[in-house]
Amino acid sequence: DVGLFQGTNQGYQLDKAPTRAEASAMLVRLLGKEAEAEKLTYTAPFTDLKGWEKPYVQYLYDNGLANGMSATAYNPTGKCSAQMYTTFLLRALGYSDAKGDFTYAKALDFGEQVGLVDAINCSTKNFLRDNVVAMSLTALDTDVKGSDSILLDKLVADGAVDKTKAASLGAFFADADAFNTAAENTSAESKMAMDMNIKASVKLGTTKLLDMSMPMTIKTDMNLKELDKSVMAFGGKLNMTIDPSLANGGDTSISQDINYYFTNGIYYMDMGAQGKYKMAMSFDDVLNGMEISAMNSSVTVSAIESITKGSGGMTVKYNMNSVFSSDLFDELLGGMLDGVSIKTRDMNVTAKA
């Protein structure tokens, strides 16, 4: 615990959109400068700050890390967007939009290039405090501009973060890097096996419309020269509890086996009671249609829940909330949720390398 994130008087509120003031505080803590900031006298030109956020804004203003919405307004209660927080973090990593390293308009694209932004830690449509935490963790494991040292190591070297407190996080980053290296070597051998469990809870206002879980296993044997001759097997069970208003007089509890199989350019689907299907399809189209192409061999650190090392290698459990798009749910649920957004979406994965 390096003290980067603090909750509100109502808890951590990870599903709440962050304000500009909250994001400013997070950035100062990320840099290990909270104690220094609290000693500053407020002289910044922004007149709309209430009090607690003044030290953080002053530090960022003094160090060229944050600007106001105008010459005299910071808009502390305004929502912090993914673009804004990415810009904050890029500046913390030593990149300067003022000096032309990137532009605010392309901050997300540049963040992706340097390994800061990914599909797991960042949501541009619904940016939450959860994303702030995930992106901040990723930033600590991202190389500082012009060096091969990650931000965490720089903060320790600068004395901004206690070396003892940072040790366990540094070890976690090292284990994650080792796992990803091993996973990439495994991918080069063309075979993959992955267990996962997708969970979804759908609400409309305060009414819960649907609960879903789908444990599954994916196995692939890639033909790296001719992808369409690759083999993929996907097996799982879809379990749903549905609000009667959606069931239209039908069952409100559903349990259904689902099995997909691909080989030699043919995609086979066994949807249980919904029928069996067979169609010609390329391997790339299968991956894109199921959003599996987003699951590469590497695991972003913000998704990892645990790493276990044993004599047979390493096992990582991780969560990929943003990977499976609504397209996959539409396919599984037959368009049942047209016009209704999924409130929470989890995919828990266990991978070995």
Regions found by a protein language model. Name each.
Residues 1-54, 63-83, 89-126, 139-177, ...:
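Feature responds to low-complexity, polar/acidic, surface-exposed segments characteristic
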Residues 24-26, 86, 312-318:
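Conserved long hydrophobic alpha-helices within structured protein cores
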Residues 124-129, 346:
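Trp-centered recognition loops
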Residues 168-353:
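Subset-of-secretome marker
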Residues 60:
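Calponin-homology-like cytoskeleton-binding modules
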